[in-house]
Amino acid sequence: MIIKVQKTFEKRLINAFMRKGNYIKAEKIYLKVVNRLSTIGIKNSYQFIRETLLKMTPIMGVVKKKRGVKELIYPKYLEPEMGEKLAIKWLKKTVAKFKGELLIENIVEEFVKASKDQGEVVKEKWALYKEVRYAISCNTRKGHHKSFVEQKLKATQRRKWY
């Protein structure tokens, strides 16, 4: 039996910023972001980062399955780790867009925007939810039977979210 060890939240975020195995540099980036948030006026910056990342994480996603020639899309509840992984991936993608400015300033700015439910990462999250709504509307059957989508959603119940 394999026991999966949970990494702490900070380690998962630091590993996302790491490039070419340079852990020390990634840790410095994370600590500079925390210091910058505290100089802005946020009292508990660690808690602030965790809460804003939870605001960025999607709860539902879309699964594509091929049935014959057709490719159908179905909504699915995401695992907490998968939702967090998507949010960190979107954060890295939005920070990489602004190459001319400082990396730390971009990360801090994105966290502050996400705390106010704005920013690129939150837009990505709502775009994913738009796909989920489209998947639900496409796959519902008319009639008195339960729709296939409702059965799929019931089968993938949402697990404990932190």
UniProtKB/Swiss-Prot annotation:
Disulfide bonds: none annotated. Its main location: mitochondrion. InterPro entries: Ribosomal_uS7, Ribosomal_uS7_dom, Ribosomal_uS7_dom_sf. GO terms for molecular function: mRNA binding; rRNA binding; structural constituent of ribosome. GO terms for biological process: ribosomal small subunit assembly; translation. One of its GO terms (cellular component) is mitochondrion. It is found in: Mitochondrion. SUPFAM superfamilies: Ribosomal protein S7 (SSF47973). Keywords: Mitochondrion, Ribonucleoprotein, Ribosomal protein, RNA-binding, rRNA-binding. Pfam families: Ribosomal_S7. Belongs to the universal ribosomal protein uS7 family. One of the primary rRNA binding proteins, it binds directly to 16S-like rRNA where it nucleates assembly of the head domain of the small subunit. Part of the small ribosomal subunit. This is Small ribosomal subunit protein uS7m. It comes from Dictyostelium discoideum. The lineage of its organism: Eukaryota, Amoebozoa, Evosea, Eumycetozoa, Dictyostelia. The gene is mrps7.
